[in-house]
Amino acid sequence: MSHVVVKNDPELDQQLANLDLNSEKQSGGASTASKGRYIPPHLRNREASKGFHDKDSSGWSCSKDKDAYSSFGSRDSRGKSGYFSERGSGSRGRFDDRGRSDYDGIGNRDRPGFGRFERSGHSRWCDKSDEDDWSKPLPPSERLEQELFSGGNTGINFEKYDDIPVEATGSNCPPHIENFSDIDMGEIIMGNIELTRYTRPTPVQKHAIPIIKGKRDLMACAQTGSGKTAAFLLPILSQIYTDGPGEALKAVKENGRYGRRKQYPISLVLAPTRELAVQIYEEARKFSYRSRVRPCVVYGGADIGQQIRDLERGCHLLVATPGRLVDMMERGKIGLDFCKYLVLDEADRMLDMGFEPQIRRIVEQDTMPPKGVRHTMMFSATFPKEIQMLARDFLDEYIFLAVGRVGSTSENITQKVVWVEDLDKRSFLLDLLGATGRDSLTLVFVETKKGADSLEDFLYHEGYACTSIHGDRSQRDREEALHQFRSGKSPILVATAVAARGLDISNVRHVINFDLPSDIEEYVHRIGRTGRVGNLGLATSFFNEKNMNITKDLLDLLVEAKQEVPSWLENMAYEHHYKGGSRGRSKRFSGGFGARDYRQSSGSSSSGFGASRGSSSRSGGSGYGNSRGFGGGGYGGFYNSDGYGGNYNSQGVDWWGN
């Protein structure tokens, strides 16, 4: 092998210098384009290679003059991913709650739960929203508008609300409004009110909105279906839009610097059930459309991991059940340090379900601002004495608002009570369903979970499209059942009491108490699922010997609501009263305390607002045993009854008087 000495050749030296990765200055500054870059063999000695390693030309450049990448997947100077949008993920993989598209600046589709938030984990908080005007609406989204506002009905009987009496007690009560335009709630709220097709406020909204806008605490007692949810959401969101995020935004930013993802909601709404929490959340989505406010909902029975991921995208208004909220707080995911607005919806129901320890833990034993600093509202259809005493601890110089017949039922609901033995209930139910038509939404209440499954199976084999919900069903199954019912695919829903409170299912035409509850207040909430927000409705209850304990209360309720009272029920109530059966009467009818502000009672036994009427003047008759008068004692002869059953006859008028 021969060794040949090669003379120094300038071109060869240049190539060797280019192969030296550790020498950025080999070319003596004459060829700054190379900067020690390796040149692929197919580009060596070509003129086209001169611009290939230009530091300004492409992503191959690794110049230290830039502290962030500029290509797909790059990082900007603030350490945030260029691929991940700084605005956070959207709602349900379509558009987010404020109308932004799923596509970020580089055309990448947003995938829920796929990290489309910055490293600190709270996208909507950590943008430049502190510099933005929260009162200005964001751009509209036609697709999101269709999703949020496509349904709804204000009701054909809305005018009747003008005559409902209202009683407000408390110092310096703000004057009520007659129209939404009478009070300044901002451009965003007024636009969303128009989209929801609300023409004018209901009585509870007329009084509650100016009270909350005036930053006064409130305890409101209104009939079910009267628009309580909008009564507190509208003024709370209006105030948030006006005031902005305040200190909560800084707290989230500061917290995020250390890798934590704790959220500090500005408003908290507590609800007793998962269904009611989801319903309030959906309403909050409507009224926060085109705003920078992001509502969230957390409840038990669902994947907590998914709920945490949703929270980490930002949370300004939180709707929660008490148990799941305590869990989130103990995990360090929720802080209430900057909560300005607290709402307890269906407060009596939460106490009935045993949530008082959790509520006090949330309100009194954590970091929530004390009363007088935060603004607190309590809403429910009934307010017994225990709830009003709880208000002393949570509310500061509050206003008590009683709308209509407190704890009573709406006159928009036609109530029918029929005597049906247990063995005849299924046959009578089939007759009712046949009379009301297969397209009408019908809600059937039973007392037990087993009874719900059994009745659903019976109706299915009779050819009826039906579904059911109760406490043993998974959250997913319950939500699917409610969706099938709302959409009309399964127009018959069999339910236990889990669905009785707070559910806002539009256009329920008929509520049937297949099994009457033992508590008259539960009866009030059950039949309140129909006749909502001015719509007309019908409630039919099957009564027999097992329901003797609510005879007197049921009679008083029918009289209050100006309903037709069967003569046999009057006779039963009279006899039951004089046998001492009134000992089991509910708190609602024990002097009517839940109907008025306890601060005004001063120990008096006054019956108060909407108190029950006595029945001492009822006819003694011949005793209820011989006065059922339904032909054969069962449902068979009931069609010819003068007082009630005539509307069942297919040859006469229907249930609705047509």
Swiss-Prot record:
Family according to the record: Belongs to the DEAD box helicase family. DDX3/DED1 subfamily.
Reaction catalysed by this enzyme: ATP + H2O = ADP + phosphate + H(+)
Residue span(s) of domain Helicase C-terminal: 412-573
Localization, UniProt: Cytoplasm; Nucleus
Superkingdom in the source lineage: Eukaryota
One term under GO cellular component: cytoplasm
Gene3D superfamilies named in the record: P-loop containing nucleotide triphosphate hydrolases
Function recorded in the entry: Probable ATP-dependent RNA helicase. May play a role in spermatogenesis.
Main location: cytoplasm
Domain Helicase ATP-binding stretches: 209-401
Organism encoding this protein: Pongo abelii
Subunit relationships: May interact with TDRD3.
Annotated segments matching region Disordered: 1-141, 597-625
Protein name stated in the entry: ATP-dependent RNA helicase DDX3Y
Cross-link (Glycyl lysine isopeptide (Lys-Gly) (interchain with G-Cter in SUMO2)): K213
Motif DEAD box per record, residues: 345-348
Bias (Low complexity): 601-619
Sorted UniProt keywords: Acetylation, ATP-binding, Cytoplasm, DNA-binding, Helicase, Hydrolase, Isopeptide bond, Methylation, Nucleotide-binding, Nucleus, Phosphoprotein, RNA-binding, Ubl conjugation
